[in-house]
Design a protein with these regions (language model features):
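Active-site loop/helix belt of alpha/beta enzymes
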Residues: 1-105, 109-113
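C-terminal accessory subdomain/extension
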Residues: 111-215
Length: 215
């Protein structure tokens, strides 16, 4: 700071810190970090006479549960998508609603017979005649390969499980239990269809990731 003040061509516009543990139920560490930050700001003003115009440290978790940390500005990240930063953050203070949905469509439908396999490696082999739909989305688009054989999509308000591996630019789902499905039908990868819902939190749990990676 003394170096900056010794260079009049440099103008200090702001200062910030970023909480490491504000998304945990126990806020002891976060409050300690806030205290250190505030003490540093006070020292700059008291000892050096420098008043910093903009001070900020609140991320999404702090915005929700640490209002005393909001200072001059806040950084709403995951909450701008209507999602909570962790399961330990209270959902009662500010009710959020997911703001993001992700859709695709069916490009191909076919029936495979018992003993036939789907996708790379033949990880899924049909035990009976199975109706299969192809979705033109894959890990090249950011849809996790780790959802292979675990995830599902929504078609006509019903769940359609992923069959076999998610490929680079497509994956296949089981539509055997969904009557009338045809090419061009809307597919919900994230969001609501009828009474069913796929959340970023659920996709995170199924894929071994977390909701941030889906938005």
């Amino acid at each position: 700071v003394r170096f900056l003040m010794g260079h009049p061509e440099l103008e200090v516009e702001g200062i910030f810190t970023h909480f490491a543990k504000s998304d945990e139920e126990d806020k002891t560490s976060a409050y300690h970090q806030l205290e250190l930050f505030q003490n540093f700001i006070d020292r700059i003003q008291t000892e050096l006479g420098l008043t910093i115009p903009v001070k900020h440290c609140s991320n999404s978790a702090a915005i929700l549960e640490m209002p005393q940390a909001n200072m001059d500005m806040v950084r709403a990240g995951i909450t701008t998508y209507g999602l909570y930063p962790s399961e330990e953050v209270s959902k009662d203070i500010v009710p959020l609603r997911a703001a993001m949905s992700l859709y695709s469509h069916i490009v191909y439908c076919k029936t495979i017979h018992a003993g036939q396999s789907v996708s790379y490696g033949g990880l899924f082999t049909a035990q009976k005649d199975t109706r299969v739909a192809t979705i033109p989305v894959g890990y090249g688009d950011g849809y996790p390969r780790s959802l292979s054989g675990k995830g599902y999509v929504l078609i006509r308000g019903k769940k359609a499980p992923i069959l076999g591996r998610v490929c680079m630019d497509q994956f296949m789902v089981d539509i055997s239990e969904i009557p009338g499905v045809m090419e061009g039908d809307k597919v919900t990868l994230l969001g609501v269809d009828g009474t069913e819902r796929i959340t970023a939190e659920e996709l995170g749990e199924l894929s071994g990731r977390f909701n941030y990676e889906f938005v």
